Amino acid sequence: MTTHQLTQLTRTLVQVAMGKIPADTVIRNGRWVCVQSGEIIPNTDIAIKDGRIAFVGADVSHTLGKQTNVINAGDRYLVPGLLDGHMHVESGMVTVTEFVRAVILHGTTGMFIDPHEIANVFGLKGVRLMVDEAAVQPIHVWVQMPSCVPSAPGLETPGASIGPQEVAEAMKWEGIIGLGEMMNFPGVMNADEKMHAEMAETRSAGKVVGGHYASLELGKEFHGYVAGGPEDDHEGTRVEDAVARVRQGMKVMMRLGSAWHDVASQIRAITEMGFDPRHFILCTDDSHSETLINQGHMDRVVSHAITQGINPITAIQLATINPAEHFGVAREVGMIAPGRYADILLISSLPKFEVEMVIAKGQIAAQNGKLLMDIPAFPYPTWAVSSVNLGRELTARDFRLTAPVSSGKVKAHIIGVIENQAPTQHLVMEVNVVKGEVSPDIERDILKVALVERHKGTGEVQVGLVNGFGLDQPCAIATTVAHDSHHMIVVGTSDSDMAIAANKLGQVGGGQVVVLDGEVIGMVELPIAGLMSNERAELVAEKASGILEAFRTCGCTLNNPNMQLSLLALVVIPELRISDLGLVDVNEFDFVPVLES
């Protein structure tokens, strides 16, 4: 906003507050949840003009005009619109527009998004695409410039790369709020010049450096990471993680997404240890479309926090004023107060936290779960829907795992999936060798996992082993949503089904697919960067539900298997991952063999 525009805005708001010109909309007879003071103030009225709040007080009569729209709150709570402190739109497998369409029903009026998924596919032009789409939304969508593309140089090959020069360019763009999660924590604590230059460009622009410390180690490595400059972190899973971060000056982002459930463990720092809640923020990180449609978004997170014993007002603060102050936008959002955007929720019960009306930027956006505004689709360019390039037709032979011996047993390094958590285990187990090959061992839940290069058409396939998916049929599951470089991941019990699954995704331009005994039994097409659908969120959720059902048919009982599948190549979260270059021990940031000689 220019100086002239801001001058005109504040002059107008003053005139409404003084009763000299009428408000566009007033809300009467509500219970004001004043997050800035921690009070609930009854009998409150609010006057709104040009999408902003002009007056909050006991009587708004002096702001009424003949054309003023009057909303009777009926003694319901007036809650600031909810903010998601850290999230990735691409995890919903829908566009920014469709994500907004889904979450606005649940009271989300602002999101801080890190589009490092599309950045790994398209680089800076992919980020620009997301910034442009974010700018035309009916809610606030701030973009963090992705920091680690690739997330681990030398351990993976991305479709694109980003460095200090690109970060410096993006910091000039309107809509860029800061630097996305600094996932290369070894790079930070080992004083890597590129990582520190990116953080320096961000801080020079006066913006926030996002953190990502995915290690359980809280000794000198953690202290070294914090000294490097990251200002928040959402990777904590234990109360001691929250304690350490707050004591070292970081904001603790507690996440409840589709697969990550880290609020209950860390909120104990507030409820049991008496830590100042100002240093805590709620977020989702990754939410699938079916979670958004069937369970909700930030309303779900706030409600969950309340069930963990935190005061409802405090829970709301963690999703409103806290993230707003952290990112430096509290003059615009995060509270119900003059000058701020009129992002207001009407709710009958705080403990239940069921959103009945959503006002976004002064407009009634949703009521009782129904969208009341039109949100036009964003036109994606042709280049954004042609990103999957396998280079050739894959066959069952590409998914063989050749052993160093012709028969007997060998020690194998196996990725161990942990239910509801992002980290994996580095398992070392003996596996059987028959005719020079290692095959899946269904009884012990040892399956094949393959990483298929899909950006440059090299035809390269890396094969390893994984435990935890529980597949017990001749089948395969595959996805091009494969954090962070977003190649293609395939897990299966059958080499031929793994080839069918991979080739199918190559044909449709990306997505997720389940193949059972040679037949496709579930699929969601994701043609935009191989990450997002161009269809409505409800349809994507329906297809995603079909994928989950197909997982179950194949024997998988994980709570959120497609999310766990998508993280098998995330070589910045311990302990063991697979990349297009081999099997990676994340703790050592080095390669290990799948099979020992």
Q: Could you tell me what each predicted segment is?
A:
Residues 126, 161-181, 187-254, 261-282, ...:
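Histidine/acidic residue-rich metal-binding segments in metalloenzymes
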Residues 103, 134, 202-203, 225, ...:
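A generic structural signal for well-ordered alpha-helical segments
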Residues 88-90, 116-118, 146-151, 182-185, ...:
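Active-site beta-loop-alpha junctions enriched in small/polar residues
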Residues 2-17, 21-22, 97-208, 273-275, ...:
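Divalent-metal coordination cores built from histidine and acidic residues
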Residues 1-44, 48-54, 59, 104-106, ...:
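Active-site microenvironment of metallo-dependent hydrolases
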Residues 26, 81-83, 209, 282, ...:
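Residue-level marker for buried hydrophobic side chains located in beta-strands
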Residues 21-23, 65-68, 73-74, 78, ...:
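Short coil/turn connectors at secondary-structure junctions
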